[in-house]
């Protein structure tokens, strides 16, 4: 999802949240120490042992399984009524050890029914969820659900019983689907009216040359059946995103002939939908590291820029091993593209589709450059981009990700456009490759993605949009405010205004702290990359992530997971005293530090002596493993004039007032 709204929110929080930096005092005015090292470092962190499905070391176990859903989708867009109608054929494979007497499907469009559960909980103003009050006949019309079977070489379609409950559909099977590879085929006919604004994930943008349809959650999708919860059937109410099975997609999209369609996957019939000149431009773009214009702004009003002779054209796309698909269609599209160079030597395409209103040298004319750079960086750093194309669409949606295609705000420019483009394509790795449960654990895709965005932004174009360094002490006061729920909350279970901090920034900040202050970049990057490789195209849980980082890095981090992710613990480190061995500075200094709040962290001290010499000292987090207060000997040779804790403000210390000791004060 779009992080730009979150950044605006964070600025508002910084401006308006009441500071909480003051330390806790009792009725007599004495400082209260809230730290409990037994709570922080308790060895009882994991609630279950490893098993054949998920190992204790964080790997998929030898008997790990997941089900599969392959889709053949054929839809038609009516750009006058905004109706999308279609047929899907699902091939569902049950690799679980359980027989399944019924299956569950997701009907996300039903969020936009007037009587939906999601609509009932959307506030009247200030929410990005729902359809922003649009009055229309939203939701799916399910025309038929049939089971396809083959009998004596003849295809038989049999109607099956089904029940629709809000954004879910339960289909009752005439006989149980066998475990360990049992397979069925379903055929569903359906239609829906696209909302103008679809919960910031899809919708319709009006431009002077026509509507831009950004189409997502556009077909009934299989729910995930896994070894953790069985059927994952939490309803779609808006705040939480998705949890989906992997499979192959065969997509046919029929639209008015003056439209251009971009989609997840690879276009397989360019000769039917592009002019000969445009086909040649595509070939040139596939060999170019610079952006090549496929359809220019000046051609938008030229009927020769579209194939003639038909009222409608059908666009065919294919996509392998993906968890979803989305597409966009418009007569208003300017199209440009360039090749992407991947570490293995393979090539992919960076593509942009936008209206003339979004065009400009500081705007969407750089979109393909941004798309190419973001995906090439992450491919080199983590795991190779897996899709034949990466398409950026100027959309009514502020920012939303799908496999090989993203929707970004049509008015974004310069750093804002880089930021949203990099963020949405960063989702290729989380959750498109690493298929975590977004509905329960948004921080495992938004937060992880926000973290890799910070590295990509630092790298891009010599630091053109390098993130500014933020004062972690100020952030520490904000993100541990008692108004925030723990990170380990689902978006459905936190205030909407808190999602930006809890799903995006705080979990990303946690990874940065681990990388820069706890583990070190080399060990952390190796562990993080291992997590991606282990769980590529699989379904990890938080425990799988925690265990992988610990096992690969070789560190027990339960104190960190417990304080930063499971709870909302504050950090407050203090320098409380400086004395000398036998009252002689030449024999060494006795420096006392204290941890006053529940979160432990390593200690960084800057020590300045009388001659002006300044030195740095770092103490491991283990000093707090059995101590609230710690005194250590510093090898001084002269009098110390000051000791400062965390001088560079790289730790989220919520109270800076006690971070320094100064001689004579």
Task: Give the positions of each predicted feature.
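Beta-strand-rich binding/interaction modules
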Residues: 262-263, 573-574, 580-646
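Short, hydrophobic/aromatic-enriched beta-strand segments in well-ordered soluble domains
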Residues: 88-90, 94, 107-109, 182-196, ...
């Amino acid at each position: 999802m779009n992080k730009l709204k979150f950044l605006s929110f964070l600025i508002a929080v910084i401006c308006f949240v009441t500071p909480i930096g003051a330390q806790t005092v009792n009725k007599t005015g004495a400082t209260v120490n809230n730290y409990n090292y037994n709570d922080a470092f308790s060895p009882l962190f994991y609630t279950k042992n490893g098993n054949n499905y998920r190992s204790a070391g964080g790997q998929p176990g030898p008997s790990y399984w997941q089900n599969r859903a392959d889709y053949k989708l054929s839809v038609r867009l009516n750009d006058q009524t905004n109706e999308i109608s279609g047929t899907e054929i699902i091939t569902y494979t049950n690799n679980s050890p359980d027989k399944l007497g019924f299956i569950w499907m997701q009907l996300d469009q039903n969020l936009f029914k007037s009587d939906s559960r999601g609509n009932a909980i959307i506030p009247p103003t200030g929410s990005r969820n729902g359809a922003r009050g649009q009055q229309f006949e939203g939701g799916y019309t399910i025309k038929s659900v049939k089971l396809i079977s083959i009998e004596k070489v003849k295809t038989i379609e049999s109607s099956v019983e089904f029940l629709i409950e809000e954004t879910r559909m339960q289909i009752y099977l005439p006989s149980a689907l066998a475990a360990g590879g049992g397979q069925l085929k379903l055929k569903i006919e359906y239609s829906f009216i696209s909302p103008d604004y679809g919960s910031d994930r899809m919708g319709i943008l009006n431009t002077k040359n026509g509507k831009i349809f950004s189409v997502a959650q556009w077909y009934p999708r299989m729910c995930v059946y896994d070894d953790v919860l069985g059927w994952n059937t939490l309803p779609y109410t808006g705040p939480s995103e998705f949890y989906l099975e992997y499979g192959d997609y065969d997509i046919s999209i029929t639209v008015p002939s003056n439209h251009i369609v971009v989609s997840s996957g690879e276009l397989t019939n360019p000769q039917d939908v592009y002019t000969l000149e445009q086909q040649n431009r595509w070939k040139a773009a596939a060999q170019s590291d610079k952006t090549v214009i496929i359809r220019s702004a000046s051609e938008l009003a030229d009927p020769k820029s579209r194939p003639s002779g038909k009222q409608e054209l059908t666009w065919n796309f294919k996509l392998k091993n993906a968890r979803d698909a989305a597409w966009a269609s418009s007569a208003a599209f300017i199209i440009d593209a360039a090749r992407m160079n991947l570490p293995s030597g393979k090539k992919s395409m960076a593509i942009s589709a936008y209206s003339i209103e979004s065009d400009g040298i500081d705007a969407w004319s750089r979109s393909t450059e941004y798309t190419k750079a973001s995906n090439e960086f992450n491919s080199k750093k983590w795991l190779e981009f897996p899709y034949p194309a990466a398409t950026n669409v100027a959309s009514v949606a502020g920012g939303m990700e799908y496999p090989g295609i993203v929707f970004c705000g049509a008015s974004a420019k310069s750093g804002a456009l880089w930021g949203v483009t990099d963020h949405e394509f960063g989702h290729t790795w989380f959750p498109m490759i690493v298929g975590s449960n977004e509905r329960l654990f948004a921080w495992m895709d938004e937060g992880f993605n926000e973290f890799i965005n910070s590295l990509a932004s630092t790298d891009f174009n010599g630091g053109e949009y390098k993130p500014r360094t933020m004062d972690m002490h100020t952030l520490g006061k904000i993100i541990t405010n008692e108004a925030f729920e723990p990170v380990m909350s689902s978006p459905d279970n936190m205030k909407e205004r808190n999602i930006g901090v809890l799903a995006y920034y705080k979990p990303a900040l946690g990874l940065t702290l681990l990388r820069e202050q706890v583990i070190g970049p080399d060990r952390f990057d190796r562990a993080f990359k291992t997590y991606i490789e282990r769980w590529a195209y699989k379904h990890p849980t938080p425990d799988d992530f925690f265990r992988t980082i610990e096992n690969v890095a070789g560190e027990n981090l339960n104190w960190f997971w417990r304080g930063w992710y499971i709870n909302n613990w504050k950090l407050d480190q203090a320098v409380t005293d400086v004395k000398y061995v036998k009252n002689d500075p030449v024999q060494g200094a006795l420096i006392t530090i204290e941890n006053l709040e529940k979160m432990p962290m390593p200690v960084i001290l800057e020590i300045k002596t009388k001659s002006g010499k300044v030195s740095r000292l770092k103490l491991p987090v283990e000093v707090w493993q059995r101590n609230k207060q710690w005194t250590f000997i510093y090898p001084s040779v002269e009098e110390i004039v000051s000791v400062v804790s965390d001088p560079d403000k790289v730790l989220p210390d919520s109270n800076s007032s006690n971070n320094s000791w100064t001689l004579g004060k």
